[in-house]
Every structure is written in C-alpha cells, then in structure tokens.
Amino acid sequence: EPKEEPNDGLYRANYPEGIYYTVDDFLKKIPNETTKVDARELIGFDKELLDSIEDNCFCYYQNSDSKVKKVFAISYKGHLYFQTRAILSNRNKDDNAQTNDFPNSFVRVKNGGENYLYLETRLVNKWAQGFAYGGVGGTSGYYLATDMTHTKGIIWDFKNKEFNIFKNCKDYNRFIEKIHPGSIQKCKNQQPDIEAIRKTIEIIK
C-alpha cells in the first residue's frame, strides 16, 4: 500500500528517494544511489540532526557521517532538494555574479509543476560583496557584505534545463514578461516582492 502523505501543506515533488549525481540522472528520475542520508542544520559547530523538514540544510551519509558533496539533487523523505553548488553551476548565463557561503548545502523545492520547480535561498552578488569587504573593510565591511545577502527566488526550468535566479526586481520582470505579463512588478525596491513571486509560480508552474 502507498504511504499516506503527511498533511503538512508542504510541496512534494514526485522523485524516487535517493541521490542524483547529474542533470541527466535527475531528468530520468533514476537515482545513482539510495544510501541513507540525514539532514543537518547549516549553522553551528555540531551540525545537529534536523527533525523537521527545513528549506536549507546539509546532508550527511548515515553510514560514514560525511557530508554529501558535488551532487545535483537529493530526494529525501518525499522532498526534493537541489545542491547549491549545482544551482550555481547550472544557472542561466545572465546569473553569473550570484554566490553563496554554503555551496554544499541543499535547498528544498517549495512548489512546482510540469514547467518549473521553485525554490528560495539566500544569495549575494559577489562583485558587490567583494567591494563591501575591500572598500570598507573591518567589521563595517563584514556587516555591509552580509546585509547584501537576500532571499532569492529560483526556478528550475525544465524546457531549458537550467536554473534561473531572480537576481533583482528588473531581472524577475524580464523573465515573467514573456510568460505572464500580468505578474510584472512595479519594482519599488531593488528586490522583487517574494510573496508576489510565490503567487505567480502557482499560475505558471
């Protein structure tokens, strides 16, 4: 009998449990290995085990207690996670300046359909961050650089086989105007309204 899905309101992508090494493996829905993994928290020296399903985490092999690195995706407890390194390696060519402090971390897919999978993680423009570190320096430079890190909406585009990172509001509008012009944002701030993006994903996914 199929297991009943927990009624927790969280999106679950239909991928067999396991680790996917490459884009092709992921698209075929054939995991390369089904070794058991644990999700652990990003912050903290001990990297505690996570009881709940989190949007961002590290994954560790249960049998060796070593961190899962250099893979494309993991299907874990019914949830699909992309590795941050894979997102940055398979992104749209216009998204090159985006970076993240935890390339081996995993990001959970929050929504999706036949066209797109949607996720969110904290990214920063590495050129702007480098300027903050180098131009100001010291503690002020650190806080300025940290402050430049924003939660970004990201989609996996099945048709183009790439991730598209919504770097800023104008970048998001360039993407959405071709697909759903009614969802273009007014860009009162540099970053787009993430709540509005989530509603749009519900329409275009």
Predicted regions and their residues:
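Bacterial Sec-dependent signal peptides at the C-terminal "C-region" and cleavage site
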Residues: 1-3
